[in-house]
Amino acid sequence: MVKCLLLSFLIIAIFIGVPTAKGDVNFDLSTATAKTYTKFIEDFRATLPFSHKVYDIPLLYSTISDSRRFILLDLTSYAYETISVAIDVTNVYVVAYRTRDVSYFFKESPPEAYNILFKGTRKITLPYTGNYENLQTAAHKIRENIDLGLPALSSAITTLFYYNAQSAPSALLVLIQTTAEAARFKYIERHVAKYVATNFKPNLAIISLENQWSALSKQIFLAQNQGGKFRNPVDLIKPTGERFQVTNVDSDVVKGNIKLLLNSRASTADENFITTMTLLGESVVN
C-alpha cells in the first residue's frame, strides 16, 4: 500500500513538474469579480508584515529576516495557467515569478531572492530591472499606453506563463500595477476593480501616485513631528491632467487611499531621513 502511494506521488510530481508550495495569496481570474479582486488585494495587504502604523497606515519593515522576506502570489488566467509571483515584503516590489519548472528574476533582484525562491527550478535572469523606466524601454511603450484591467491581467499571466520575450515587459508592467500598486493605493485598486470585463488606459492620477509612493511615504512619516504637515509638498496630477500639491496627512490622497508606507533605514525623523529608494522622475522601481 505504501509503495503504491509513493508511486502515485512520483507520477503526480513528474506530471506537474517541480513541486512548489502553494502561494500565500491566490487569485483565479477564471471566476473573478470586482469583489473577489478586492478581496485578493485586501488579503495581499494583510499578508505583508509591518512595524507599526503611522496615521493608521501600516509602515513596512525596512529589514526583515530572510525567511520572512518574500511572499508568493499565485495568479491563474482565464485559461487556467498559473504563475507564482514573488513579492519583497520590505517594499512590495515584484522580484521574480515562476511558471512550471522555470523561474524568472529581475536583473536587480536581491541575492537572497535567488537563494530562497523557487528552489529546484531553472533560474533565468531577465535582461532588465523592475524599474518602470527600464520596463517601458524594453516594452517600447509608456504605461499610459498599456491596457490595465482584469482581462489585461489574464493576458499578462498567459504571456508570462509561456514567456514571450517580446511581450514580457508589457505583461510585467500590467502585473505590477494590478497587484503591487493596487496594494499600495486604494484609488488604483478601485479603478482596476471597475474593469472586470473590459480594459482601460491608466490616467495621469494613477501614474503620478505610482511615481510618488516613496515621496508620500517619506512625508507622511516626517509629518509625525510636524503636526501632520509635510516638510516638503508632494506634486501629483489629477485625472484631468491638472497638477496639485499634497501638503498634509488630512488630504484625501492620504486618508483612505494610501494603504502601505515605504520604510527607511534612518533611526530618527530628521533631515537625514533616507528612503529605501530614490525617486528620479520616471525612474521608479515597481
UniProtKB/Swiss-Prot annotation:
For this protein, the record's InterPro entries field holds:
Ribosome-inact_prot_sf, Ribosome_inactivat_1/2, Ribosome_inactivat_prot, Ribosome_inactivat_prot_CS, Ribosome_inactivat_prot_sub1, Ribosome_inactivat_prot_sub2
| Top-level EC class | hydrolase
Q: Give the positions the UniProt entry annotates as the active site.
A: 181
Which Gene Ontology BP terms does the record give?
defense response; negative regulation of translation
Domain of life the protein comes from = Eukaryota
Q: What is its EC number?
A: 3.2.2.22
Single GO MF descriptor: rRNA N-glycosylase activity
- Look up keyword rRNA-binding and say if it applies: no
> Gene3D superfamilies recorded for this chain?
Ricin (A subunit), domain 1, Ricin (A Subunit), domain 2
* Catalytic activities: Endohydrolysis of the N-glycosidic bond at one specific adenosine on the 28S rRNA
Q: Which UniProt keywords apply?
A: Hydrolase, Plant defense, Protein synthesis inhibitor, Signal, Toxin
What SUPFAM superfamilies is this protein classified in?
Ribosome inactivating proteins (RIP)
Residues annotated as signal peptide: 1-23
Q: What family is this protein classified in?
A: Belongs to the ribosome-inactivating protein family. Type 1 RIP subfamily.
Put simply, this protein is called Ribosome-inactivating protein momordin II
Q: Which organism is it from?
A: Momordica balsamina (Bitter gourd)
